[in-house]
Amino acid sequence: MRLKNGCNIKTIHKVPTLEEALLAAKGKIMINLDKADRYFDQVYELLQKTGTTEQIIMKGSKPAKEVKARFGKYLDEVIYMPIVNLDKEDAKRQIDVFVEDMRPAAFELLFVKDSNPLPRMLADSLKGESLIWYNTLWDTMAGGHDDDMSLANPDEGYGYLIDVLGCRIIQTDRPAYLLDYLRKRGLHD
């Protein structure tokens, strides 16, 4: 299997195995294993083999009780980050339970529109408890403050998430652009 370029043409670059990717990243970066919860027993064996358990962020949208039952034996070694859809009726309660039971390092928060008051409230209530992570890949994940908005007006995109919603982690498809913006604002070395 080969990687494709922006024109959907196969390149000479081979798609690495998870083990190869873990070894390449070892000691350099945090690794977001999105959707790995379904296979985490097998993934964990690779993490131990490669010595990368402390670099892993495992995310999921299951309730705290289920996370503790299913992944409890791993939670001292890997970072578990809950994904909470703030447009759901029980979102605030889910967050409160996670903070009380698991004290997560961060939450990935999702919401479709700025009319939802919860993102602003959480900027204050999670301060000092957990970091806030927003995903800017699509306009439906961070109230429209996505990568595309940020290209046109970075203060309305990334800046809004940082300044108004207390975001400290941004998942983006435009890392160089985001880093440039953060450096211009004195928020990154």
Predicted features, each with a name:
Residues 10-11, 83, 88-189:
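C-terminal active-site rim and adjoining tail of enzyme catalytic domains
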Residues 1-88, 101-105, 109-112, 128, ...:
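Metal-dependent phosphodiesterase/phospholipase catalytic core, i.e.
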